């Protein structure tokens, strides 16, 4: 999805949005991250989950959402165009009624493992605290 702004009778793209649901395949996430990183405008990556458990975000088999996001951003970091551009990451757990979000900028690639808790193996959405991640609980 793209958001446009009308300026002097012309439409200019100002935001790209990509959506995922469930714990989808890494290739599917990679495709969306490559698009967001390569574009000149800001982006948003929204991932909707039914629920999370101890292996949802990071695990030894590297099949968690953070594992896949880390690998995708690592692989495409050289494609990032603009120092001022940002990508907002939003992950929502419906059953737990929790939303986590973070803004990622080019300088975050220096600490990408920390951003995605790669060495800590965070599993459930309730475990995601710090490293720039914010939490919001819905009722």
Labelled PLM ranges:
Residues 4-6, 52-53:
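Short regulatory "switch" loops immediately downstream of catalytic or recognition motifs
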Residues 49-139:
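Domain-level recognition of nuclease-like catalytic cores that cleave nucleotide substrates
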Residues 25-47, 65-77:
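Short, charged, amphipathic alpha-helix that recurs within catalytic cores of restriction-modification
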Residues 5-10, 77-80:
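Alpha-helix termini
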Residues 21-26, 52-55:
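Short acidic, S/G/P-rich loop/turn micro-motifs used as interaction or catalytic elements
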Residues 15, 41-50, 89:
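Hydrophobic beta-strand segments of well-ordered beta-sheets in folded domains
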Residues 3, 18, 44, 108, ...:
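Intrinsic disorder/low-structure terminal segments
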Residues 1-5, 12-23:
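Conserved catalytic cores of phosphodiester-cleaving nucleases, focusing on short active-site segments
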């Amino acid at each position: 999805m793209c958001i446009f702004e009308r300026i002097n009778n012309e439409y200019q793209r100002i935001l790209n949005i990509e959506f995922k649901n469930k714990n989808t395949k890494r290739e599917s996430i990679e495709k969306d991250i490559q698009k967001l990183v390569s574009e000149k405008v800001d982006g948003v990556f929204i991932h909707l989950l039914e629920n999370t458990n101890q292996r949802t975000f990071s695990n030894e088999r590297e099949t968690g959402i953070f594992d896949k996001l880390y690998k995708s951003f690592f692989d495409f970091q050289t494609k990032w165009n603009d120092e001022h551009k940002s990508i907002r990451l939003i992950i929502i757990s419906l059953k737990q009624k929790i939303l986590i979000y973070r803004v990622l900028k080019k300088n975050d690639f220096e600490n990408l493992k920390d951003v995605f808790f790669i060495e800590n193996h965070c599993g459930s959405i309730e475990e995601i605290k710090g490293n720039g991640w914010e939490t919001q609980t819905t009722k």
